[in-house]
Amino acid sequence: MSLVVAGRVALSLALGSVLLAGCARFDDSASSPFTPEPTVNPADPKPPKQPPTPGARPTGPCIDPDPAVVATCLDTTGGLIALGDSALVAERRTGRILKVVPVDPSSPQETPTEVARVDVDGSGDGGLSDIALSPTFREDGLIYAYITTATDNRVVRIAEGGPPKAILTGIPKGATGNHGSIEFVTPTQMLVLTGDAGNPSAAVSPSSLGGKLLRVNSPAPGSTAEVVVSGIGTAGDVCGDGKDSVWITDRTATEDRLQLLAKDSTVTTAWTWPDRPGVAGCAAASDGVAIALTGAKAVAIAVADPNTHAVTSSPSLIAQDKYGQLGGAAAGGDGTIWVATVNKTDGQPGPFDDRVVRIPPPQGGGGSD
């Protein structure tokens, strides 16, 4: 188990190849700058388990009978990274980064293992919003995080044996609007989606980093950022398809939006929701994007033309009202969509919340919502 001692992060990061199957249906092999995908192992690994005895999953505290539920009894969650046969999930208020591993349907969910922890200000909607692995993670073991501090929102880099290093600072902090997202879209380019800190005027101000999509090249301590998109409201997520397009979700006072950033940096609005279902995390594929919905308690599947990326039909909903309010989303290597719930702060928590869930791949295309 990893520890944090006197502000220094201890990580145990072992790496290996992950064989990824599937193609179009939200397969993270198409949307990741990692080749092959890394895996993350905690310190002091547990001995191999004996094959489970077939039967029903036992009952008890923090044991969810739903076979799709991977982890239970988490604090409210932030970002989520699928790693093939496991995942990393951030706890927004505690600053912990946890590894979660699925088990067979007859076994109780395993207790998540802490991989790292960073100090955050988790008040309001701030804290540890998102995480991303370095594209050279196999060599350097670095994790990037979007966090709220006592003075600002910022991007930091976490390495074994040292304190987090500031990569991008000065993103405005407010009572609300602190959530942000980070995504490596190439091995040397990170996109940073920032909230408006509850101040819509910051989103259109050239002097503010708030309410923007920012580009950071070769992220390192003291990096500067280039503004790619202005006018972001409450930041949802940014997710790339690994080829030529990046999707952005955000919430405004009048509508929730799904925007498309093309390879030439032009931005178009792909879809809007006047009923404001609470767009949050997203997972992209070459022919669409899955969006976690907080208020609507579902995953929206927006099918896009693989050539033009146009969304022409109303996104369909899956897993509606099954797991409560959803935040983070990530693409699994087998076509599944990993999601993390945010019921402890945004919804009505049940006895197993908050949770990480693997949702089976959707069958068919879009439809009415």
Where are the regions a protein language model picked out?
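Sequence/structural signature of beta-propeller domains
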Residues: 2-369
